[in-house]
Amino acid sequence: MSMVSEFKEFALKGNVMDLAVGVIIGGAFATITKSLVEDVIMPIVAFIVGGEINFKNMFLILGDAPEGVARTNDALKAAGIPVLAYGSFITVLINFLILAFIIFMMVKMVNRLRRADEVEEAIEEAIEEPSEEVQLLREISAKLGNINK
């Protein structure tokens, strides 16, 4: 089998295609979550706190910053000055926690639907096929009914 045909067989398997779709949707979902945090949640938090909250401006300068360089995270990094940008980390952490919670809720919902389907199938099977004892009792009842007539 040639390398091309092996790759084609691998790439067209259902699991690989499902994974590719999941990765693409996950990337888009991460962008949505980032926008949710930056454009919706943080402005609400800033309104409640009574001021603007910008985690990007939360950092520690590690070393000396030369004169004339603005004291912002982006300007210091552009100047090559080491900066401990813990505010950016907090933003990424909030994004992750929201994304993880949403995925957890989705998995929980899917599991609930699966369990409901399994219970429904079990009920249908139980209704469709009576147990051996029930079948035996029905046979005995039918024979007794024929004798009494």
UniProtKB/Swiss-Prot annotation:
| Gene Ontology cellular-component terms listed | plasma membrane
Q: Which domain of life is it from?
A: Bacteria
Q: Which GO terms describe its molecular function?
A: mechanosensitive monoatomic ion channel activity
Q: Which residues cross the membrane?
A: 10-30, 41-61, 87-107
Sorted keywords for this record are:
Cell inner membrane, Cell membrane, Ion channel, Ion transport, Membrane, Transmembrane, Transmembrane helix, Transport
Q: Briefly, what is this protein's role? A: Channel that opens in response to stretch forces in the membrane lipid bilayer. May participate in the regulation of osmotic pressure changes within the cell.
Subunit structure, as described in the record: Homopentamer.
Q: What is this protein called?
A: Large-conductance mechanosensitive channel
Q: Which organism is it from?
A: Psychrobacter cryohalolentis (strain ATCC BAA-1226 / DSM 17306 / VKM B-2378 / K5)
| Lineage of origin | Bacteria, Pseudomonadati, Pseudomonadota, Gammaproteobacteria, Moraxellales
